[in-house]
Swiss-Prot record:
Substrate binds at R106, N144, E345, I346, S347, H348. Coiled coil: none annotated. InterPro entries: Beta_galactosidase_C, Beta_galactosidase_Trimer, Class_I_gatase-like, Glyco_hydro_42, Glyco_hydro_42_N, Glycoside_hydrolase_SF. It catalyses: Hydrolysis of terminal non-reducing beta-D-galactose residues in beta-D-galactosides. One of its GO terms (molecular function) is metal ion binding. Pfam families: Glyco_hydro_42, Glyco_hydro_42C, Glyco_hydro_42M. GO terms for biological process: galactose metabolic process. May play a role in the degradation of rhamnogalacturonan derived from plant cell walls. This is Beta-galactosidase YesZ.
């Protein structure tokens, strides 16, 4: 990295010349050194079909660059113009009720429609040709927030592509029928063309149909990203990304497979700071070895016509920025620079108001810039320490849980809650996609992944055999790749590999079921598995409710390491304490060295450089915190010596400690 970026999303096409110049001047004063432009400007670039002119944006990029501000240019494909959509319902997105989306509000077109793909390729080619080699253009963003407002499309184009996808996957219809078990409810198909989309139906569609359609849709949107990236690379060497999210119906691992760096948006409040940190720990690993970007976060609050959050507490924005840079980000950017005077998001927080004055978040933006300048030399001379503990993250698992949410489960909430238990123990951690290598890790958690591929099981079991500890569950391994039930044993290949026998799987009632582990008794909930206590070493036993007397937490030696099966989810305060005790127990057994006793609400981001180990300590919750320094070190901000022992951190404060004897 050559610099840290501090930026904003900017829409010069919405403003007159005088306002644009005012914006650029104030950006320089604030310290904004990058902007993102163009993602919603298709009708400005091509007001009439076939009449494309991107000269305005060429001029803007040049003017910004002359003022020391670099640009990430976007393709404008979320917002096809009215000439594309008017009177052409076949080009539009159809939701699961087969309702056709109208023009406007963005993402109204079906991204699989062949005419959309054709026009998207033409506008992308024109932009890349004209702007691709400009000085000041440092990157490309494809589209914006794929599937933000929509999920799977049910139009006729998608139906045809769905049938093609099924043919490629199964070859002959008999294989599909066998794999899905379509004899249920007389659902057997005679041709691929008979397989429906999971649209309106009297009751629930078949699990296999619902999950496979989601996976099909995820592959289709990724193929659109591939197509756009390929076009841009013909005319530009600048790296390509997409502004993604874990909230949407996409497979981010697949989406970023052919892109150059990972980026996303997050609007986590101070009360939900763990979600902000989760994103940093995940997106750092989607393109390993490359810094990630936060392309959108609010300088104060998020809002639309129908909802609004509250402004951040003073200091929280700085804590977000410093923690993101410390955890591997190169860019920290706001949505948006100047409040929009019209549209659906006129009430959204911004850096400047629509009338050009500082907003409620302005002083916090200035604080971020002061912090960026202060820590930039440290960040540029170090890199994040390799974590020794990892947690598996899977967007494909999200599809399975969307199909089968049991009692209203949400994948994101499950993952965030489990992540918080690891975070609260002070362990430096990674969230890694299913396909990530396990080199360098000692401890692996794999919760909430209903289907585990054979490839993943082989990789994770090899990790355990070589000395790692693999903790799997809850809600893991109980479904096949087709979203059917195993017929050989409860958890299929996972059970066979671990050697731990599953006795029953059933929904535990946390008002009835309790279990005990690590000296803690807690309610148990979620769709659960209980295990034969003779097939492994029992660490947790169901004490009350169905399954009482059987193990819900058990381990078994596997080569030089262990496989641990967590069959149920401890809940409530006692459950959180039990899970954190589990994390600490196995972190000690795995000899995790990259950890601290930092108080909850404060984080330690360890970094390493030529001069050794650096801890960047940041308070996120606004309550202040502390951590024990294992040895003496130098505060790189004050240049004072800090002795080994307790280090206090004030509300939203950050400290940077270079250890004297640690490398």
């Amino acid at each position: 990295m050559r610099k840290l970026y501090h930026g904003a999303c900017y829409y010069p096409e919405l403003w007159d010349e005088e306002t644009i110049q005012q914006d650029i001047d104030i950006m320089r004063e604030v310290g904004v050194n990058v902007v993102r432009i163009g993602e919603f400007a298709w009708s400005v670039m091509e007001p009439e079909e076939g009449k494309i002119d991107v000269g305005f944006f060429k001029e803007i990029i040049a003017r910004l660059y002359d003022s020391g501000i670099e640009t990430i240019m976007c393709t404008p494909t979320p917002t096809p113009p009215i000439w594309f959509s008017h009177g052409r319902p076949e080009r539009m997105h159809a939701n699961e009720k087969r309702e056709i989306m109208g023009h406007g509000s963005r993402q109204h077109a079906c991204t699989n429609n062949p005419y959309f793909r054709k026009k998207a390729a033409i506008i992308t080619t024109a932009i890349a040709k004209e702007l691709g080699r400009l000085p000041g253009l440092i990157g490309w963003q494809l589209d914006n927030e794929f599937k933000c407002h929509v999920a799977e499309c049910m139009c006729e184009t998608c139906l045809r592509l769905w049938h093609d996808w099924l043919k490629n996957r199964y070859g002959v219809i008999e294989r599909l029928n066998e794999a899905w078990g379509t004899d249920v409810w007389s659902e057997t198909y005679q041709t691929f063309e008979q397989v429906p989309q999971p649209g309106p139906a009297p009751f629930l569609h078949h699990a296999s149909l619902r999950t496979m359609y989601q996976l099909f849709s995820m592959e289709m949107i990724a193929s659109f990203a591939d197509e756009q990236a390929k076009i841009i690379r013909c005319y530009s060497d600048a790296p390509i990304t997409h502004n993604g999210s874990v909230m949407f119906s996409v497979d981010n691992e697949r989406m970023f497979q052919n892109l150059d760096f990972a980026s996303y948006d997050t609007y986590a409040s101070q009360e939900n700071a763990s979600a902000f940190l989760l994103n940093c720990d995940l997106w750092r690993n989607l393109k390993q070895g490359r810094p990630f970007w936060i392309l959108e976060t609010s300088p104060s609050y998020a809002a639309s016509l129908e909802s609004s959050a509250y402004p951040h507490a003073d200091g929280y924005l700085q804590a977000e920025a410093v923690s993101s840079y410390a955890l591997g980000s190169q860019g920290f950017c706001y949505w948006l620079w100047r409040q929009q005077r019209s549209g659906s998001e006129i009430s959204h927080g911004s850096v400047l108001s629509a009338w050009g004055e500082p907003t409620i978040g302005y002083q916090n933006v200035l604080a971020v810039e002061r912090a960026r300048k202060e820590i930039e030399p440290i960040i540029l001379s170090t890199e994040p320490v390799q974590a020794e503990a990892a947690m598996t993250y899977s967007d494909r698992a999200k599809a399975f849980i969307k199909t089968e949410p049991h009692r209203g489960l949400r994948h994101r909430s499950l993952v965030t809650h489990f992540y918080e238990r690891i975070l609260n123990t002070g362990i430096h951690r990674d969230l890694i996609p299913e396909g990530a290598p396990l080199d360098g890790y000692r401890l692996l958690f794999t919760p909430f992944v209903p289907y585990l591929s054979s490839e993943f099981i082989k990789k994770a079991s090899a990790f355990a055999e070589a000395g790692g500890i693999w903790i799997t569950g809850p809600l893991t391994g109980g479904r096949t790749c087709e979203h059917t039930i195993h017929t050989d044993c409860g958890l299929g290949e996972l059970e066979k590999t671990s050697g731990i026998k599953t006795l029953f799987t059933f929904p535990m009632n946390e008002n009835v079921n309790t279990g005990k582990a690590f000296g803690i008794t807690a309610p148990l909930g979620l769709w659960s598995a209980v295990f034969d206590t003779e097939s492994g070493n029992t660490l947790g036993t169901v004490e009350a409710g169905p399954g009482a007397g059987h193990a819900f937490l058990t381990e078994r030696n596997y080569g030089e390491g262990k496989i641990v099966m967590l069959g149920s989810l401890p809940s409530g305060k006692e459950g959180d304490a039990m899970l954190e005790a589990l994390v600490r127990h196995y972190a000690e057994e795995a000899v995790i060295s990259s950890r601290s006793d930092v108080t909850p609400g404060t984080i330690v981001a360890p970094r390493i450089g030529e001069n050794g180990l650096v801890w960047i300590v940041v308070n996120m919750d606004g309550k202040g915190g502390s951590v024990t320094l294992p040895e003496s070190g130098t505060d790189l901000l004050t240049h004072r010596l800090e002795k080994a022992g307790r280090l206090a951190v004030g509300p939203h404060e950050y400290r940077v400690i270079q250890f004297d004897n640690h490398s």
